[in-house]
Amino acid sequence: MSVKARRISGRLETVVTKVNYAFDPVDDDKIIRNRLLTRTTTTRGEPPLKKLQKKFTSFVLEVDKEEENYNDCGRLAKAFLQELSTFEIPLLKSQAVVEANLREKESFNEVKDETERQIMQAKAEIEDLKKQLEESKIDRQHKEECETIRKLISAQPPRSETEKVIYELNKEIAELEAESTASWRLLELRKKQFALLMHVVDELQNTMEDEQKSLVDEIRSASEDQRNITDAMSVD
């Protein structure tokens, strides 16, 4: 799997492409490690480093011979240099691959940093949206409450009618208070009249009792006088 980055509308977009391997990923790692160590481009054949070693060994052995073998030494030296040149090409390719991998890694890190930045920005935007949502909910609730109050107010009668009703009620209350005051005064007057009547009744009753006592005393006195006269006549 390889990761590539491309810029679309001012932002980096990560493109992931899937590669189908002929070997298991674990085997791939072993093969790649072996190729990097031996500089081989295929899994078959003799490693270039070993071939270079053989060429160098053949050249050294030929040089160590105590014979006039300049032609063979030249031939082996030329073969060794050719093999060395052939071995250098994969090294340059590997170096180019390493540099490309480093550039790709750097690009991947940039994409990663940009992605993390975008994630953090998205999280911040989500938090802001959450706050805005809560604020909008509160505003909506306030609007609904205001609408409910407005409906209640609109359902009430006009102010002029209310003031008229209040005026009529105050007038009725004043009349009731006046009637109550008049009733209280009349009640007080009736209380005083009743008290005076009771006093007069008491005086009449006392007078009648006194008159009855006087009448009884007069009758008793007349009876005694009559009795005395009768007694006197009897004695004569």
UniProtKB/Swiss-Prot annotation:
The keyword Coiled coil applies. Residues 99-228 form a coiled coil. One of its GO terms (biological process) is mRNA transport. Signal peptide: none annotated. Its main location: nucleus. GO terms for molecular function: RNA binding. It comes from the Eukaryota. One of its GO terms (cellular component) is THO complex part of transcription export complex. It is found in: Nucleus. Keywords: Coiled coil, mRNA processing, mRNA splicing, mRNA transport, Nucleus, RNA-binding, Transport. It holds the Pfam family THOC7. Component of the THO complex, which is composed of THO1, THO2, THO3, THO5, THO6 and THO7. Acts as a component of the THO subcomplex of the TREX complex which is thought to couple mRNA transcription, processing and nuclear export. PANTHER family: MAINTENANCE OF KILLER 16 MAK16 PROTEIN-RELATED (PTHR23405), THO COMPLEX SUBUNIT 7 HOMOLOG (PTHR23405:SF5). Belongs to the THOC7 family. This is THO complex subunit 7B. It comes from Arabidopsis thaliana (Mouse-ear cress). The gene is THO7B.
